[in-house]
């Protein structure tokens, strides 16, 4: 008997789920109205009904109903050698994974990129990159994502999830540009058990 027969008609889950997780996180961020406002409105008060731009122009700031995926929120890595950035953006990608048998850990990197001119907000000392990072922390830190409170089609493939923020870093993209980068590393555990296919 072939020792691999027990794996016939089964599919490994670890790397497969790793690829789905960044898309899941991007989808969740795209459904957060505050994050969408921080990304779309380059004003000093993006959560208000009216916003004050840097040139003192007042604009109307309505809720954003359209998806920001592939416009402001990207399920991919960013170009680390970019010289300029004219609008705020978020990039999400699977950072790494580790497995020790039937259980694995997957790390997701969320990179928040903000042009330095848009970093400051009206509230004393508040910064756009940290405001977005705080929204992400509130969405994911120690929150169990189960079938009853998430996108059903993704959770059916991923299983119940619990995220933890492992670290964050804040700095400039490079010494020669004015792009602020706030990187958050999320961790979640996934089953690596092979499933029948």
Language-model features: locations:
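Long, contiguous binding/interaction regions
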Residues: 197
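Short acidic, glycine/tyrosine-flanked loop/strand segments centered on an H-E-D-like triad
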Residues: 103-121
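Beta-strand elements of well-folded, non-transmembrane domains
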Residues: 96-98, 112-118, 188-194
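Acidic-leaning, charged glycine-interspersed low-complexity segments
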Residues: 129-191
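Hydrophobic residues positioned within well-ordered beta-strands of beta-sheet architectures
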Residues: 90, 106-110, 182-186
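Short, flexible/disordered intra-domain loops and linkers
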Residues: 7, 120-127
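Short, solvent-exposed beta-strand/turn "edge" segments of beta-rich domains on protein surfaces
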Residues: 98-104, 174-179
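Small/polar-rich, solvent-exposed N-terminal microdomains that initiate assembly or binding
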Residues: 1-99
């Amino acid at each position: 008997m072939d020792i691999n027969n027990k794996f016939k008609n089964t599919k490994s889950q670890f790397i497969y789920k790793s690829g789905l997780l960044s898309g899941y996180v991007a989808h969740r961020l795209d459904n957060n109205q505050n994050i969408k406002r921080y990304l779309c409105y380059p004003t000093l008060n993006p959560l208000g009904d009216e916003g004050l731009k840097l040139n003192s122009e007042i604009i109307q700031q309505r809720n954003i109903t359209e998806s920001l995926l592939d416009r402001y929120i990207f399920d991919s890595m960013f170009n680390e050698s970019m010289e300029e950035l004219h609008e705020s953006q978020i990039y999400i990608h699977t950072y790494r994974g580790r497995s020790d048998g039937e259980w694995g850990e997957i790390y997701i990197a969320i990179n928040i990129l903000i042009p330095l001119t848009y970093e400051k907000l009206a509230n004393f000392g508040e910064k756009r990159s940290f405001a977005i990072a705080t929204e992400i922390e509130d969405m994911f830190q120690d929150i169990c994502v189960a079938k009853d409170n998430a996108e059903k089609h993704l959770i059916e493939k991923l299983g119940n999830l619990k995220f933890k923020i492992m670290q964050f870093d804040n700095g400039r993209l490079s010494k020669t540009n004015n792009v602020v980068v706030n990187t958050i590393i999320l961790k979640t555990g996934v089953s690596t058990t092979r499933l029948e296919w």
